[in-house]
C-alpha cells in the first residue's frame, strides 16, 4: 500500500489491534479529514493500476462505493474483499451492529464500481481460508433467500465447487459449511450474525474439526 500510494496525494493511516469490523472501520474513518476515505483490508494485495482517484457524486445521497476484487482462490471478481470508499460520517455515526443488516457495508446506501482494486489472498492458513469462505457463503445464501439473482447463485456455486492454490480444501470446507449453517438457521439475522464474531467462528471451527488451528 505504501509503495503504490507513495506518489499519490492520499494520506495513509494504518489501523490494527481493534476488535470487530465495525469498530475497526470507525477507527479508520475517524482518522480521515475528508468526507470519504478508502479502506484497504489486510487480506488483499492492491492492484498497482488502482489510483484511488474516484470522485463521489456529491449531488447524490451519501453512500459507500465498493470496488471489485479478484478472489485468488476461485477467480471470482466482485465486491467481496474489495477496496471500499466509505462515507466517514455514516461509518462514525453508525448504530450498533445488532440494529443493522447482516453485512455492515450493505446496511447503507452503496454503489458498486466495476474497477479492479485488489486481489484477495485470504487463504494464508487453514483457519483463515475456512473462515473467509464460511462467512461469505452464509452471507450470500442469506442474500439469495431474500432477493434471488443469477449473480449470487453463480457465486455460491463457484465458492462451493471451485478452489485452487494454498489451502484450497479448507476454502471448500468453509464455503460448504457456511451454506450448511445458513440452511440450518434460515434467515434469522440474530443467529446468522454469529458468523461475524471471531470467537464464535474459532470455536465452531475447532469443534467441528476437532483440531486447533492457527487463528492468525
Regions found by a protein language model. Name each.
Residues 35-51:
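Short beta-strand-to-loop acidic/aromatic patch adjacent to the donor-nucleotide binding site
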